[in-house]
């Protein structure tokens, strides 16, 4: 594992010595990927600090769930590894929840990002369903799964599925805190080698 800043500095130097366009493009992609990761780390730290200080603002309103899912389907369909299918399951297109649009996007994006990272083959499914007075969201994958020893700590700060895969270790902590601030809860079911299923709930808005 190479920290993002080290990679940015290192490949910025290497690109000046690159002789072919292919080599320059390869280094540019690495720099861009690690720059995005570093920006995400800064944003995660800022959001965590705001949540802990109880100063993060939420714009709570009724949200049509299918609109969020269609946006995320378009955003993530090309980010899966070769041959992996991203599938938005059949859902109630008229279902609403109460929450902050941007924060719900942030939560599901984090779960989908993890699923694409840890699913080298098979399928990733996501969607939602009604559960009493709540909407239950889910992201299910056929990836590497999570060792039992890590499940208990995965939503704690710096809890990671795999120490050798790049990531901030803050994303799932943020997901938990954001979900709880909007009146829900988050959990997972997983078995090593058999994929993972992440769930979270938010209040259901009856039309």
For each predicted feature, which ranges?
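Helix-loop junction within the histidine kinase core
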Residues: 49-60
